Amino acid sequence: MADNKTTATELLERLHKMAIFRLSLGSKELFHSNFLEYLWDCDKESFKEIIRNLCGDNQVLTADQKYFISREKENFDVCIYHTSNNEEDGKAVYDVIIENKVKSIPYKEQLAEYVGKVADKKQEKSPAYLLLSLAKDFPDKEDEEIKDTWKVVHYGTLRDAIWAQEKWRSEPFVEEYCDFIKTLDELGAAILDGMDREYLFPNVEDYKKERLHDLYIKMRCSWFATALKTELGKNIDKRKIRIVSKYEERLPDCVNLNVAMNQGNGQIAAWICDRNMNTFEIVIQGDQYRHGINQIGIKKSKSKEIENDYYQVKENDRASFKHFVLNWLYGRLENLQDVNAYYFLNFLDDFNCFNSNQSDIRPESKKEKVYYFRKTKTPKAGPFDCYSDDYIYRYVSISNCTVHTLRDKMLNDILRIFYNLPDLS
């Protein structure tokens, strides 16, 4: 962990002065793969020793045969392999697979895909799988499939292993590289230090200058999602909590958690689906906390149009308001089965701990509020919004909400909708 006296600002300034850091910005993960290949070329035996130490297996890369290293071969970040004819372009038998996750979040599905790709080759012996991660914790880290197959190695550990090879210290760039990843490791710790007491993204602008804002956002989102998953596991069967890399991977009767960058903002999403894949979502995106409903096969409402781009409804007419929202969601009024869908969206009044932007609710008069439902795909600030005919959401601002409070709120909302899923059939 970073020294308490070394602030994130000081670490960013230290990185700024490193030429090797500037060179890494072109492709952060490919850069590290390239440097591993460079170390292999410097001294193969020392590199093999490092791999054995990191894998915790003294039998790796010990056979009396010629080994080769490659980057991006069959989409593996780095692989070490041998061939039956001892020629580099021969049929590869993989001995070590290395996956780099410097700025990205490891996902079980992606890692399982790599393992499956090797399994399809029906090798006599499985390779060693090494996952290099800057984040010490990520949502899928404790998954049994990952723990049984992949050796997760933190970049700080990689730095120590490289520096322990004294013969490498005189090689060009090795000292600079070790100093670079040591500083990056300390910065990663500083990014998360005291996070539970802070806002979710309070200092993102500080990282943009060094083009590290994506790293800052992803690490904090990953930490948040990991903590959220842990708390969910105390209330829901852990087999029903899934980490997914994209919306299309969600499954019914599960809490599908996603961490991503969306339009330059950090996103932490919980997608809960019924058997028809109608989806209720609880999403943090940037400084917004959203509840949304995405219904399959919805048709456009024939409600009265206003201003060419909006539907209008008055809140004081409660029956009309509910029917409008639900009719808009479901397409046909006669299909309405459960008004809980409306109450799922109507959550602003429960957010006393958040600073709701009251300007988002535009009053037509002092006595009643008028809501505008956007019909176009371009979002507009408002208490309700939509991107298409089948998706509506509502949001509040969370710019002044601590991570601890936000996590508890999201946890409670997920449990509420998971155990009381509205019927959209």
Regions from the PLM with identified roles:
Residues 2-56:
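A structured, charge-rich N-terminal accessory region that forms the first stable segment of a protein
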Residues 2-11, 15, 71-74, 80-253, ...:
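Acidic metal-coordinating catalytic centers involved in nucleic-acid phosphodiester chemistry
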Residues 26, 30, 174, 214, ...:
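Generic detection of long, well-ordered alpha-helical segments
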Residues 37, 48-55, 115, 229, ...:
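Generic solvent-exposed, charged/amphipathic alpha-helical segments
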Residues 39, 117, 121, 328, ...:
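Conserved short hydrophobic interaction patches
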Residues 47-73, 246-248, 254-260:
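A short acidic/basic microdomain associated with nuclease active sites
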Residues 202-387:
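Polyanion-binding interface signature
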Residues 384-425:
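Charge-dense, extended regions
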